[in-house]
From Swiss-Prot:
Antibodies against PNMA2 are present in sera from patients suffering of paraneoplastic neurological disorders. The keyword Nucleus applies. This is Paraneoplastic antigen Ma2. The keyword Nucleus applies. The gene is PNMA2. It comes from Homo sapiens (Human). Residues 335-364 are annotated as: Disordered. Signal peptide: none annotated.
Length: 364
């Protein structure tokens, strides 16, 4: 991180990074004269230098300065740290062989992957580096070209997102950090859709959240069918760990659910939605008519005032039934309007009493 900052800073200041130093850990309240006093004493063996700039590093809560060496210096003479006021100041510098070492590791990695440096540049959208020119380019220049290529490489259309799943084991006595199957399944069903990776990688990430019997099941279904999809894996989990409730039971439970005394219509609809989704998952209710079934059940199972009944009846007659959120919006608006009307009704008698007393005093 510090070395990368040194390289970027040198690039901005247009100075040779091989002839520059960065000193970090300088107390933020130090003036330039105080910094110079310490550096002149501790770096005098390096010869003449020039202080090019100072920045504040938030992560260290301290300053850093960039120095340009004005004389040829033996790298071995550069200290890695100096004793400054307020503590030790670190000295960051780039050794001449760091680019070479990096490129050696890069070549070794590419060789293992069956790739070449020129092929890597082509993949980054840089066509100017051919196989014939690579051996003729110095390590320093090649590292510089690679840095430029990486900076200008096209970014992926989708950011790499990896929302980690919670843990599920399927054990009879789950550990405290584990989720119930229903909660885990709901989260897994949503999150796997966001993972912009291959099916194989999705299955690997899915397996990372599993323990015990659940992980055993994952291994079994993959052994039986190596090309099984993530959705099919989740379906297998439903069959093994899901509720044993039948289609008919799920359907009847939904249709026999009514608004309870004192329960708001919006709260009833929210409670009903959980049962509807379960019935749809069991294929007890076709997904394509879920909105219609929801609206009909609310009209049949809830105690509605005349205004809300008329609005829902209008929605049913006019066209496609509303979605869950659209229906909730209509119901919440009506509940707020009804609550506002009730508050006004409570305040009106008090206002009439006040006017009566005022008129009575006026008569006196």
């Amino acid at each position: 991180m510090a070395l990368a900052l040194l390289e970027d800073w040198c690039r901005i200041m247009s100075v040779d990074e091989q002839k520059s130093l960065m000193v970090t850990g300088i107390p933020a309240d130090f003036e330039e004269a105080e910094i110079q006093e310490v550096l002149q004493e501790t770096l005098k063996s390096l010869g003449r230098y020039r202080l090019l700039g100072k920045i504040f590093r938030k992560q260290e809560n301290a300053n850093a300065v960039l120095l340009e060496l004005l004389e040829d210096t033996d790298v071995s003479a550069i200290p890695s740290e100096v004793q400054g006021k307020g503590g030790v100041w670190k000295v960051i510098f780039k050794t001449p062989n760091q680019d070479t070492e990096f490129l050696e590791r890069l070549n070794l990695f590419l060789e293992k992957e069956g790739q070449t440096v020129s092929g890597m540049f082509r993949a980054l959208g840089q066509e100017g580096v051919s196989p014939a020119t690579v051996p003729c380019i110095s390590p320093e220049l090649l590292a510089h070209l690679l840095g430029q290529a990486m900076a200008h490489a096209p970014q992926p259309l989708l950011p790499m997102r990896y929302r980690k799943l919670r843990v599920f084991s399927g054990s009879a006595v789950p550990a405290p950090e584990e989720e119930s199957f229903e909660v885990w399944l709901e989260q897994a069903t949503e999150i796997v859709k966001e993972w912009p990776v291959t099916e194989a990688e999705k299955k690997r990430w899915l397996a990372e959240s599993l323990r015990g019997p659940a992980l055993d099941l994952m291994h079994i279904v993959q052994a039986d069918n190596p090309s099984i999809s993530v959705e099919e894996c989740l379906e297998a989990f439903k069959q093994v760990f899901g509720s044993l409730e039948s289609r008919r039971t799920a359907q009847v439970r939904y249709l026999k659910t009514y608004q309870e005394e004192g329960e708001k219509v919006s709260a009833y609809v929210l409670r009903l939605e959980t049962l509807l989704r379960r019935a749809v998952e069991k294929r007890a209710i076709p997904r394509r008519i879920a909105d219609q079934v929801r609206l009909e059940q609310v009209m049949a199972g809830a105690t509605l005032n005349q205004m809300l009944w008329c609005r829902l009846r209008e929605l049913k007659d006019q066209g496609p039934p509303p979605s869950f959120l659209e229906l909730m919006k209509v119901i919440r608006e009506e509940e707020e309007e009804e609550a506002s009307f009730e508050n006004e009704s409570i305040e009106e008698p008090e206002e009439r009493d006040g006017y009566g007393r005022w008129n009575h005093e006026g008569d006196d």
